[in-house]
Amino acid sequence: EIHLHPMDIKLSEEGYARGEEARAWYAKSRGPVRNPEATEEELLALVQKNGPVRRIPMEGGTVFELGGRTIEVIHTPGHSLGSVCLLDRENRLLFTGDMCNDSLLLNCGDSSSTVKVYNESMRRLWAREKEFDFICLGHDALDKADKTMITDYIEATDLLLSGQAHGEKGRNALHGGTGYKYKRVLIWYEPERLV
């Protein structure tokens, strides 16, 4: 089962068609960060074959129980149009996934939001900052992070939207395109998709 925002169902179905290939790439590119002692063959052995999957729509505002925790879904379009963050009020944690990490991708064509929509999502999260003490990022971040990373993204996108800053063409180990580095964050975006 996959619980996801309805706006990401089609994207999930398209990605699932090449899921084994994507998981193999992920194992090779990210696996060494989490398990540096493993060989590439050992990492690839962890990649599972595609099987049947049921997609369950999950809207913003949904509240559910997960392992004794009450979780609220917050719809935050950005990396994908159906991106969500998960608020664990009791433990004062906000799970941001791909919405807030050290390298944000908004350059995925029509499956990503504009910079303006992303900025609005981050402002909605920050308006609730009294409800969480830390954020839990996606991918390689295994520890809790300083929640003010959200304000870095707000400031960076404000600068891009006002024309006071511009990204540069570039590439890092995993991504490429137009990127803008600001304080602790890096935004990959499409200049023609600011607003």
Which functions belong to the PLM regions below?
Residues 1-65, 102, 153-170:
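Active-site HxH/HxHxD metal-binding segment of metal-dependent hydrolases
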Residues 2, 93-95, 136:
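Residue-level marker for buried hydrophobic side chains located in beta-strands
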Residues 16, 106-110, 147-149:
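Short, solvent-exposed loop/turn segments at secondary-structure boundaries
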Residues 9-12, 80-83, 101-104, 138-145:
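Active-site environment of divalent metal-dependent phosphoester hydrolases
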Residues 123-195:
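Accessory terminal helices/loops
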Residues 19-28, 40-54, 116-118, 133-143, ...:
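Noncatalytic linker/hinge segments flanking ATPase motor cores
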Residues 38, 43-127:
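Catalytic core of the metallo-beta-lactamase
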